Design a protein with these regions (language model features):
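Non-catalytic C-terminal accessory modules of carbohydrate-active enzymes
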Residues: 1-120
Length: 120
């Protein structure tokens, strides 16, 4: 994903991937009807981060699970500030340590929130 985003100008994710095998070349093959930014894809990076960081919010239960986070290879540290979970805002720090990604709860604002961090 990072390699694909870095090849486009301005840097961004492609609107779609067609499923053909990857071939060597200077950049991904452009597909004119899909290579213009479209609003439906604007949330792709947030969904990517949610999956990579293992964020599973349960707002009605006042709970946030962080399950086996994994930072991508190009990123050694990431801080997520004031992430909304129901009426609460949570700040988390993720840091690579060897092959593992560690998660640290830095703070909770607003309503009550239980944060469960499960590392592999």
């Amino acid at each position: 994903m990072h390699e694909a985003a870095a090849q486009l100008e301005p840097p961004r994710l492609p609107e779609l991937f067609c499923g053909m095998a990857r071939v060597r070349g200077p950049r991904p093959v452009l597909y004119p009807v899909s290579c213009s930014p479209q609003a439906w894809a604007s949330g792709a990076m947030f969904m990517f981060l949610q999956a990579a960081l293992g964020l599973l919010p349960q707002a009605s239960e006042h709970m946030l699970h962080v399950r086996e986070p994994q930072l991508p290879p190009f990123l050694n540290e990431l801080t997520v500030e004031r992430l909304a979970v129901g009426d609460s805002r949570v700040t988390l720090q993720f840091r690579r340590q060897g092959s593992r990604t560690l998660a640290n709860l830095l703070g909770v604002e607003g309503g009550p929130l239980q944060v469960r961090i499960e590392l592999s």
